[in-house]
Amino acid sequence: MKKAELLAPAGNMEKFKMALHYGADAVYLGGKMFNLRAGSNNFSDEELEEAVQYAHERGKRIYVTLNIIPHNDELETLPEYVKFLEKVGVDGVIVADLGVFQVVKENSNLNISISTQASNTNWRSVKMWKDMGAKRVVLAREISLEHIKEIREKVPDIELEVFVHGAMCMAISGRCLLSNYMTGRDANRGDCAQACRWKYSLVEETRPGETMPVYEDEHGTYIFNSKDLCTIEMIDKILDAGVDSLKIEGRMKGIYYVSNCVKVYKDALNSYYSGNFEYNPEWRTELESISNRSYTEGFYHGKAGVESLNYNNRNSYSQTHKLVAKIEKKLSDNEYLVAIRNKLFVGQEVQIVSPEIKVRDFIMPEMILLDKMGRETESVESANPNSFVKIKTDIPMDELDMLRIVL
């Protein structure tokens, strides 16, 4: 049986390595041009070469996003960049625009995935892309599980990729003009201002400046503000539909989000392919630990109703835990270099987060603060963000494991 791929976001090199450490089979990332995450750090050409080598040494894959909707003046440098991507050995590119698709076909033999931006919701469009030479189609988020099954039946010889977790867009597959209209920032060229998350009030034209409330609480009205997608409770049904890749959204999210999402969905995949799938409530508990706008299963059951919208404050993220540190390096059997992300105290109760679902409780031992040259300075009672400390403990940990606290 061919196993579905778990595809994780990587906004920079650190997130890339964390995604692989926690179990991703592949990552998708952007270079400095032609992708829809201008706010992400993204990868220079040198970093991209390094990432490809790092991934392939571990049997993992890399897909590069070329999913911008370009204007004429943005096409000039695309052919050379496509040739560069083929030269360094990326496993495929993700495109949304027919012109970009043609440039990739004319200048390389790269595998092409059709982006969710192309809004593929039916088997005819999927078959068209297959006939044109696409290897994979990332289906639109606005599609039901039953329609996915039908597409699989009618177009069996193309890979299907679906989103299983992350932020949802109120526009059709992200093709939104609100940001451009309101701020001049083009969402279709990587610069979305997330205007759908703003608070809106109703104004009647003969009463300028007099806003009228159309909400039931004090927060305002967030009529466009979607909850986040979470499909962990139906992941077996999605796999039964015959998809080839499960995609996690979030190139601009932090390492704790990426790592925890990956480990949860990887554990679910392993359970499914063991032949004895059983839903584990700890999966949902772990996903609640990361920052989220509350969860919905989106369009998988048909049209998404009001229950998929978040009517609370645009910043009403909820989470049960907070990242405080990352194991930067294992110095010896019981010594570790720790990168501090949030203030941390000696004697504080923390949890060790690793690729396994189970977390371990841990009391912070003595911390030796290091200076900018990496030299030991003094024992400290607390450590601040962006500092490094050395600790000793007999509790085994690995490089890239994380420490978190309960909120």
How does the language model describe each region?
Residues R37-Y54:
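Glycine-rich, positively charged N-terminal anion/phosphate-binding segment
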